[in-house]
């Protein structure tokens, strides 16, 4: 049952410009991977064939922030690294999104000292938080799917919603 059957024999499909633009944004996100600790290993696992992030249009990992629209910060951010993270975020073109992957990126993790930023949201605005130490690839995929839902609700005016926190992965592993 395709879309042409739902629309009838008119040959016309109606939608809004926001829906088409947001659909395109969700299906062509190019991530800038910022792996700083053990969460980066799980992020690489999510790119493997077992999980296949290319089905979300994310097969192109960008090395340049000027070509990326999604920053995935995975791991702890030190005070010395914070200006670098901010500079890379500022170089990304609009619209841009950030996923904080892991407890260290979300809240500093177990490193409650002067050298570690207590959450990357002190440096850049975060759209989705993925909890875990380290979070499994399924949790990252859940976070990406939540970000897709958030992007589909965005208006062309550019106003963003509040961040989404994923406390536990939606996919349970037995």
UniProtKB/Swiss-Prot annotation:
InterPro entries: NADH_UbQ_OxRdtase-like_20kDa, NADH_UQ_OxRdtase_20Kd_su. The keyword Membrane applies. It catalyses: a quinone + NADH + 5 H(+)(in) = a quinol + NAD(+) + 4 H(+)(out). NDH-1 is composed of 14 different subunits. Subunits NuoB, C, D, E, F, and G constitute the peripheral sector of the complex. Binds 1 [4Fe-4S] cluster. Its cofactor is [4Fe-4S] cluster. It is found in: Cell membrane. GO terms for cellular component: plasma membrane; respiratory chain complex I. This is NADH-quinone oxidoreductase subunit B 1. Keywords: 4Fe-4S, Cell membrane, Iron, Iron-sulfur, Membrane, Metal-binding, NAD, Quinone, Translocase, Transport, Ubiquinone. GO terms for molecular function: 4 iron, 4 sulfur cluster binding; iron ion binding; NADH dehydrogenase (ubiquinone) activity; NADH:ubiquinone reductase (non-electrogenic) activity; quinone binding. It is a peripheral membrane protein. It comes from the Bacteria. The gene is nuoB1. The keyword Kinase does not apply. GO terms for biological process: aerobic respiration; electron transport coupled proton transport.
């Amino acid at each position: 049952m395709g879309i042409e059957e739902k629309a009838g024999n008119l040959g016309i499909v109606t939608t809004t410009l926001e829906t088409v633009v947001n659909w395109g944004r969700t299906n062509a996100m190019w991530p800038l991977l910022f792996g700083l600790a053990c969460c980066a290993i799980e992020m690489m696992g999510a790119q493997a064939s077992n999980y296949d992030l290319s089905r979300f249009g994310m097969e192109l990992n960008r090395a340049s922030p000027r070509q990326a629209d999604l920053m995935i910060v995975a791991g702890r951010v030190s005070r010395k690294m914070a200006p670098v993270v901010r500079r890379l975020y500022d170089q990304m073109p609009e619209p841009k999104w950030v996923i904080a992957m892991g407890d260290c990126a979300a809240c500093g993790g177990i490193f409650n000292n002067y050298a570690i930023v207590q959450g990357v949201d002190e440096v850049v605005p975060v759209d989705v938080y993925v909890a875990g130490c380290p979070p499994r690839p399924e949790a990252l995929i859940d976070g990406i799917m939540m970000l897709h839902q958030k992007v589909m609700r965005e208006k062309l005016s550019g106003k963003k919603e509040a961040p989404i926190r994923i406390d536990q992965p939606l996919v349970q592993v037995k």
